[in-house]
Amino acid sequence: MVKPPRTPVLPRIAATALGLLAAASLQAQEVTLKVHHFLAPTSNIHENLIQPWCAKVQKESAGKLKCQLYPAMQLGGTPPQLFDQARDGTVDIVWTVPTYQAGRFPKTEVFEMPFLTEHAERASPALYEYVQKNALDEYRGVKPLFLHVNDGNILHMGKVAVRRLEDLKGLKVRAPTRLGTRILSALGATPIQMPVPAVPEAIAKGVVDGAMLPWEVATSLKMQEIAKAHVETPAGHPKISTITFALVMNQAKYDGLPAELKKVIDANSGVEASRWAGKVADAALAPARKIAQDRGNTFVTLSAEETRRWVEATAQVDDDWVREVSAKGINGKALLDDARALIRKQP
């Protein structure tokens, strides 16, 4: 019986070593991105924006890019610290509100001006274009993947159904950001700043009379149960205000990715990704509003005349902002005009 020839020992060892090296190289190509944000895992943004974005990136990279998600500040810190966590490399990606750091993003916050935006799907790509054109210096150390706004802030009131400007006088209302504080002050309310998760309990206990929030976040906060009245601008008119959001990645982490994985990140970033993010925010409005309707909550739609009064009352916010940033060498009027023009040009 003829025995099969035996493979020499050294070639077998070499082949095994090469196989292990190839496997190690493949493993090295796999990157897990730590993604941190401040909303609950049941929130619209987590379920319908961040998770799908991560799934798409994983699929298009053939599994080489994966996200490890940390909602609700699970990695510690506070929401205003998220941007620096990404910049410093504590995490790889964050979804955050840049303007939670008052005064640090003066160019970005122009999109939070009163009565500037109506639909997030239109305003969000405009915001991305605006930042790329005018405000990248505010994002040193990170790569903005996409930016967006919410579906528009309205007033969710605990017991008082605000119908006229005078009704707001002296009421304590939660403000989301620095400009939100100024807007509420201009309307006659007493602005109170607090984190989003604290709002429902604050209204329930009477710490505040209401909150300036979008419908998009209302359901995860159960605002429809806590607030009894909702104050909105008429259809076709810009909302009282909005908030700017950004998904940003540590620049060094991005720069260290293989070219093929950078392409995947790039394909899921930019103007169209921002438009999609805005669409996700807008899509949450109708279902959230319906929950409040089904509960029999009161809805107040400001009349055209009353809306005009609110717009006039908050015009000083625009003027004050322009003067403030101009004193820092920033052409505030040009930035505000550009923001309006970029929103108008969107389909």
Tell where the protein language model's regions lie, with residue ranges.
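N-terminal secretory signal peptides that target proteins for export/translocation
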Residues: 1-10
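N-terminal secretory/targeting leader peptides
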Residues: 2, 29-122, 137-347
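Bacterial N-terminal signal peptides
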Residues: 12-25
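Signature of the catalytic double-stranded beta-helix
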Residues: 125-132, 137
